[in-house]
């Protein structure tokens, strides 16, 4: 299994246990789903206790957690402060500067860095459109939530599909470290 970690905080943000695709060589998108499960239980794609008769709510003292599977599995923390347009823009500006510095440190060429800047700017502009931005949710990893560094903010967007609204986690590829487990 591949784990995708934040290059700056070492937080686990996602894994290849979710359907995923690389968009424009820039953004990893992970397809999730809403789940109900016993607290602390980690499930890989394909198993959903809420549809398998193990609801956990009926006369049980067990704690049940509900949410998006990739958020629960990787213990991501929702950060409402990024829902403010000015705050998110400011974050993007400082974060992209850090990513460019990381790319330089990792020996990326000026052409690769220029291409990244062009693509990331277009992606951020697309997120900032009013109708889209209002629908986004923002999450961070545990270490960043504890103040142990400034890393990547995971952006979650719900998209209408045949099976209903489906959550997608979006992460900047250049700010991730892939680790085999």
Swiss-Prot record:
Q: Name one GO cellular component term.
A: cytoplasm
What domain of life is recorded for the organism?
Eukaryota
Record keywords: Calcium, Cytoplasm
Tell me which InterPro entries the record gives. Answer: Mss4-like_sf, Mss4/transl-control_tumour, TCTP, Translation_control_tumour_CS, Translational_control_tumour_p
- Write the protein's name: Translationally-controlled tumor protein homolog
Its chief place of residence is: cytoplasm
Q: Where in the cell is it found?
A: Cytoplasm
Where would you find the membrane-spanning parts of this chain? none
Q: Which family does it belong to?
A: Belongs to the TCTP family.
Functional note: Involved in calcium binding and microtubule stabilization.
* Entry-linked Pfam families: TCTP
Identify the residues that the record assigns to the TCTP domain, covering every copy. 1-181
- Gene3D superfamilies from the entry? Metal Binding Protein, Guanine Nucleotide Exchange Factor, Chain A (2.170.150.10)
GO MF assignments? calcium ion binding
């Amino acid at each position: 299994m591949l784990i995708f970690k934040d290059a700056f905080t070492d937080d686990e943000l996602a894994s290849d246990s979710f359907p995923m695709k690389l968009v424009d060589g820039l953004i990893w998108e992970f397809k999730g789903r809403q789940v109900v499960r016993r607290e602390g239980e980690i499930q890989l794609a394909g198993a959903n206790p809420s549809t398998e008769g193990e609801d956990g709510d009926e006369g049980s003292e067990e704690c049940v957690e509900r949410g998006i599977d990739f958020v629960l599995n990787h213990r991501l923390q929702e950060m409402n402060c990024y829902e403010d347009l000015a705050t998110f823009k400011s974050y993007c500006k400082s974060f992209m500067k850090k990513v460019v510095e990381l790319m330089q440190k990792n020996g990326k060429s000026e052409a690769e860095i220029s291409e990244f800047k062009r693509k990331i700017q277009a992606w951020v502009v697309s997120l900032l459109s009013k109708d889209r931005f209002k629908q986004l949710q923002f999450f961070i990893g545990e270490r960043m939530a504890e103040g142990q560094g400034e890393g990547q903010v995971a952006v979650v967007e719900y998209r209408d599909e045949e099976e209903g609204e489906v959550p997608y986690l979006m992460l900047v590829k250049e700010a991730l470290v892939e680790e085999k487990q």
